[in-house]
Structures are given as C-alpha cells and as structure tokens.
Amino acid sequence: MSGATSTGDVGYDELAVLKLLALDGAHRGEVKVSCGDLASRLDASSQTASRRLQALDDADHVTRDLVSDGQWITVTDAGRHALKHEYEDYRRIFEDPGELALAGTVTSGMGEGRHYISLPGYNRQFAEKLGYEPYPGTLNVDLPPDGQRARAGIQALDGVDIDAWEDEDRTYGSATCYACTVVGDGTDFDGAHVIIPDRTHHDDDQLEIIAPVKLRERLGLLDDDEVTIRVEA
C-alpha cells in the first residue's frame, strides 16, 4: 500500500489508479489494461503500476483476469464505493454545503452526558453562547458507515466553542457545538446542537446532541428509531 494517508482500505496512490480505471469504463464492465500503458498515464514505472493494481485487487476494489497481452479489469462495488466517497469529499470542498444531513438510529448512552452537561463550568457557557440551558442528558445517535465518513464534515462547519475550565479537583476539556435540527418520524425540533468534545471516548460512529428539552419525549423517540440530524453550515 502506498501513500502516507489512506482512504478505506487503499492509499491515495491506489485511488488515483482506481479513478483512471473508472474513467476507462471499468466501473461499468471489463476493460483491458496493460501495465505499460497504465504506467505511462501515471508517470510511474511498470512495477509501480503493477503493485498498485495488486493492492486494489487485494482490497477487493477490482477483479482481474490476466491474459498474455494484459489484463481484464472490473471495478467492484467496494471500488465504486471508495470513488463515491472521494466524490462526496470534493463536493463538500467545492459546493456550498448549505447543511449536512446525517441519518442514524437512536441509542442509549452511558449516562455521562447528564453529568457533564450539568456541571457549572459547561452549563454557564451553554446559557451564554447557545442561549439556553440544556436538558441534563444527550440524545445519542448511532451512525452507519456512510454517516461516519460524513460526520467528519461537521468539523469543517462553523461551530460555537465551549472552552475548557477547571475546578479544585480537575480540568474539564473543551468542545464545539454545531446548530442542528433533529428530524424524527413526522416531526422535528429546530434549536438543538451536536456537541463534539475535543477529547472523547466516542468513536466516529456516534453523535451526541443537546437541546433545551428532552428530545426523546418531544419527538417520541425510542431506541433504534431512525432520525436525521441536519447540521447547519
């Protein structure tokens, strides 16, 4: 695998090869490829082109049928999915985002949100900067794989900084809040915020949302209910 940073199971160098293959039509069906021709288009050696094709094959991004004068290559569903992710990234760069919508399912948290949100150092800032004191607890939303990648786009939007603070016992970390609307089944609540601590044990597969009301009650939500979170740009 090449490239200092990777997307999915392959590096950016392999994604460049995948893009060339798709431009040749390999995402629709088999195309015939020679390593020499591919190397010329990549401005790389034949060995490098062959190595990148092998990496794509190993990651199940392409299927290959080797013949005497080249190889027949098809981009797989996984390969198309990787290219679609790249496309969505570029859309976020060059288009006005308007808002970022993430779909997920309601889940029960571990109760930590209730404790931290009620702490005076945070609560005071919420009132001053968000204009309300949050209900003591967070709405936790699990995100599917596609939503996890889109979640990274939230931090490119304008947010409200919640500063770190300390008391006699410890220091409490900073966070950023992003205005959002929570959409349930036939009803919604405008005036909530996604809260992302700068340091958190949560993975990218979950969102925490605060609001001046108990969102579960306001929207009639239960665990495993589907919701959409519309984060404002």
Swiss-Prot record:
Pfam family, one: CTP-dep_RFKase
Any one of the GO BP annotations: riboflavin biosynthetic process
Annotated InterPro entries: RibK_CTP-dep, Riboflavin_kinase_CTP-dep, Riboflavin_kinase_dom_sf, WH-like_DNA-bd_sf, WH_DNA-bd_sf
Catalysed reaction, written as an equation: riboflavin + CTP = CDP + FMN + H(+)
Binding note for cofactor: Binds 1 Mg(2+) ion per subunit.
Riboflavin kinase, as annotated region: 100-233
Binding site for CDP: G109, M110, G111, E112, G113, R114, V213, K214, L215, R216
Pathways per UniProt: Cofactor biosynthesis; FMN biosynthesis; FMN from riboflavin (CTP route): step 1/1
Positions with a binding annotation for Mg(2+): T138, N140
Name of the protein: Riboflavin kinase
Gene source species: Halobacterium salinarum (strain ATCC 700922 / JCM 11081 / NRC-1) (Halobacterium halobium)
